[in-house]
Every structure is written in structure tokens, then in C-alpha cells.
Amino acid sequence: MKSEIKKNDMVKVIAGDDKGKVAKVLAVLPKTSQVVVEGCKVVKKAIKPTDDNPKGGFIKKEKPMHISNVKKA
């Protein structure tokens, strides 16, 4: 599906928990028709302990949302 939304565009979320937010697009996933929007649909992800991070823990990360849930601002 061809989309006018590109990386670094400012978009407004029109559906979902973050409805009304205006933020920047971090990534566009054309195969799945999804976008990753900065600060929207944030989830806590568990990180296993590694050599770099011996304690492990949690990080907050944006999940992709369907492109129909955003429009250019």
C-alpha cells in the first residue's frame, strides 16, 4: 500500500489510547502497513542479563501501529 507518510514526518494519532497526540514518525514498515511513532504505544520490554547489562531489567519501547490510525499534521 502506497503511503504519503515518511520517516521524520509529524503525524497526529487519530485512533487508540494515544488519540490526539502529535509526534514524529521514527520508522515506516511498508510490508505490514505500520508506522512507529515517537512516544506512542509505549510498552515495557524485559531485557535478559548480558555482559553489557549484567542486571537486565526493563526498557520502554514504542510498538508499531497501523498506518490508518495516523494522519499528517
From Swiss-Prot:
Residues 53-73 are annotated as: Disordered. Keywords: Ribonucleoprotein, Ribosomal protein, RNA-binding, rRNA-binding. Residues 53-65 have a biased composition (Basic and acidic residues). GO terms for molecular function: rRNA binding; structural constituent of ribosome. InterPro entries: KOW, Rib_uL2_dom2, Ribosomal_uL24, Ribosomal_uL24_CS, Ribosomal_uL24_KOW, Translation_prot_SH3-like_sf. GO terms for biological process: translation. It comes from the Bacteria. Coiled coil: none annotated. CDD domains: KOW_RPL26. It holds the Pfam family KOW. Transmembrane segments: none annotated. GO terms for cellular component: ribonucleoprotein complex; ribosome. Belongs to the universal ribosomal protein uL24 family. Part of the 50S ribosomal subunit. One of two assembly initiator proteins, it binds directly to the 5'-end of the 23S rRNA, where it nucleates assembly of the 50S subunit. One of the proteins that surrounds the polypeptide exit tunnel on the outside of the subunit. This is Large ribosomal subunit protein uL24. The gene is rplX.
